[in-house]
């Protein structure tokens, strides 16, 4: 690879990363909207926000479907963070008394 080719590859790869980041953001917000629905339902059903068994199911599902190159441990850590933030979204929805179901 020449210097010129390397610079082109770098610029193109960064552009693709920016596009992927926007897609990830779109998916995270779509997931948060679903989590809001779950929060509403859990509030009505008087269920807890934290359900360790359900979270374990999510981790098992994503690691089972992981085709790499990201190691499954790394994928799980990313999802742990996502789920933690989604739990916060769910808490806010469950505390929102304006939505009476």
Where are these regions (language model features)?
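Domain-level signature for soluble enzymes in the chorismate/prephenate branch of the shikimate pathway
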Residues: 1-101
């Amino acid at each position: 690879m020449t210097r010129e080719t390397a610079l082109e590859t770098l610029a193109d790869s960064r552009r693709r990363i920016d596009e992927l980041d926007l897609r990830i953001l779109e998916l995270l917000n779509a997931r948060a909207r679903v989590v809001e629905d779950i929060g509403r339902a859990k509030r009505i059903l008087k269920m807890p926000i934290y359900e360790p068994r359900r979270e374990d199911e999510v981790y098992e599902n994503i690691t089972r479907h992981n085709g790499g190159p990201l190691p499954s441990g790394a994928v799980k850590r990313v999802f742990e963070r996502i789920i933690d933030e989604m739990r916060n979204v769910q808490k806010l929805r469950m505390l929102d008394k304006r939505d009476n179901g």
